[in-house]
């Protein structure tokens, strides 16, 4: 009897995903536990393993398909020598989702046709324009009915469009040929990022606090630790590792900053789980260092390296990037001095970390050169007030400027 292969739900909140690639083709033998496809979720590309043994009789949803609903039929397994008519009958009975999608597409096509007919009906006064004039008008977003034609019988020509463009400086348009850019379809990750960031800026009352941190002691301690592990290529502590640990220790001291908003109540988290923004090819992902306050700098560094590699390879599992109570975004390696990051909802805080640069400062009434790092906290004012945010930043500064406090 044929066996259904359904679109899996790779996380509790997943409703649809992209079927990125089939690793098996129709007619191939499939064994239990064998990877047969790759599914693209909102944060990573996940492998789909077969539960049963059989022949991949039919691929219903082709690769590179977007917005495939969870639990929809994507393929069918059959036993060796199973009758094709039985397989076709099985697909017809179980492929209601595909039929529904086709019906929706048909309705959309019909509606588009109706819209086009209505558009033609209202266009009672035909406008005469040369093909080049029409092309220039389209590129420059100029309505032809607003242009006075100078050609035979009022025909709009190239010069009319160019004259219209230069006649009013406030409406001056720079023409760009459509061949000067390339269009890249938005993948599922990009769409989710866009949706969440827009929602965050529109619904969360952001406010920002900045502070300068002297990281000279931290750089010295980091150098000493790395020298002691010079033979161990895996253990190489980064500045970002210290930043993660300092945030974790500060959240432990100021637990009111480790919170999120819900309509019924503010949730204060018992665990200190830190999300760290990692740039990947298709956007950004935030793997989580769980219980970061309970880890030493070596453990934290090794775990972070593993998470970054998995993120770059699109191999993160949902449990490794869903959740978290606080996010760190570090753009210092790009020379960015400071920036205001957008809160990663439903979290209430994100800290933007800038570059460490040599600056002149006053210490004991003397001007000295120090390595200064700017950090900016973006906070949700529904959850965290200014005093709590300031207390958190003061605690972070104390740990980052005195790294020994994090190591004891």
Swiss-Prot record:
SUPFAM superfamilies listed in its UniProt record: CoA-dependent acyltransferases, Peripheral subunit-binding domain of 2-oxo acid dehydrogenase complex, Single hybrid motif
Domain Peripheral subunit-binding (PSBD): from-to ranges: 128-165
GO BP: pyruvate decarboxylation to acetyl-CoA
Catalyses which reaction(s): N(6)-[(R)-dihydrolipoyl]-L-lysyl-[protein] + acetyl-CoA = N(6)-[(R)-S(8)-acetyldihydrolipoyl]-L-lysyl-[protein] + CoA
Entry's cofactor comment: Binds 1 lipoyl cofactor covalently.
Residue positions of the active site: 381
Residues the record lists as N6-lipoyllysine modifications: 43
Cofactor: (R)-lipoate
Cellular component aspect of the GO annotation: pyruvate dehydrogenase complex
The Lipoyl-binding domain, residue ranges: 2-78
Record keywords: Acyltransferase, Lipoyl, Transferase
Domain of life of the native organism: Bacteria
Keyword flag Chaperone: no
Protein family according to the UniProt entry: Belongs to the 2-oxoacid dehydrogenase family.
Name the record gives this protein: Dihydrolipoyllysine-residue acetyltransferase component of pyruvate dehydrogenase complex
Protein encoded by which gene: pdhC
């Amino acid at each position: 009897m044929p066996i259904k292969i359904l679109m899996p739900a790779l996380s509790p909140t997943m409703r649809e995903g992209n079927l990125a690639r089939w690793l098996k083709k129709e007619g191939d033998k499939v064994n239990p536990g064998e990877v047969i496809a790759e599914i693209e979720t909102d944060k990573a590309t996940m492998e789909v393993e077969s539960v049963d043994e059989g022949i991949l009789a039919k691929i219903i949803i082709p690769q590179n398909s977007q917005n495939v609903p969870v639990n929809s039929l994507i393929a069918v397994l059959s036993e060796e020598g199973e009758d094709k008519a039985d397989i076709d009958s099985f697909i017809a009975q179980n492929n209601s989702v595909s039929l529904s999608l086709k019906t929706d597409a048909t309705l959309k096509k019909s509606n588009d046709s109706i819209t086009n007919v209505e558009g033609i009906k209202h266009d009672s006064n035909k406008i005469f324009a040369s093909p080049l004039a029409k092309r220039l008008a389209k590129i420059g977003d100029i309505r032809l009915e607003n242009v006075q034609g100078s050609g035979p019988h009022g025909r709009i020509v190239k010069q009319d469009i160019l004259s219209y463009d230069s006649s009013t400086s406030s409406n001056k348009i720079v023409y760009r040929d459509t061949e000067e850019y390339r269009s890249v379809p938005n993948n599922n990750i990009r769409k989710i990022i866009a949706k969440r960031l827009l929602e965050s800026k529109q619904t969360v009352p952001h406010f920002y606090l900045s502070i300068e941190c002297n990281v000279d002691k931290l750089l010295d301690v980091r150098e000493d630790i790395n020298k002691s592990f010079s033979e161990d290529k895996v253990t190489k502590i980064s500045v970002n590792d210290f930043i993660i640990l300092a945030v974790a220790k500060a959240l432990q001291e100021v637990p009111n900053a480790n919170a999120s908003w819900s309509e019924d109540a503010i949730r204060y988290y018992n665990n200190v789980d830190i999300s760290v923004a990692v740039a990947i090819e298709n956007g950004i992902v935030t793997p989580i260092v769980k219980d970061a306050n309970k880890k030493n700098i070596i453990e934290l560094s090794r775990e972070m390296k593993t998470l970054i590699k998995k993120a770059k390879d699109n191999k993160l599992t949902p449990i490794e990037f869903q959740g978290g109570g606080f996010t760190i975004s570090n753009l210092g390696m790009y020379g960015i001095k400071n920036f205001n990051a957008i809160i990663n909802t439903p979290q209430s805080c994100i800290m933007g970390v800038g570059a460490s640069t040599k600056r002149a400062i006053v210490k004991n009434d003397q001007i000295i050169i120090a390595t200064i790092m700017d950090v900016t906290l973006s906070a949700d004012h529904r959850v965290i007030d200014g005093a709590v945010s300031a207390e958190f930043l003061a605690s972070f500064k104390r740990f980052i400027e005195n790294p020994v406090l994090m190591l004891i």
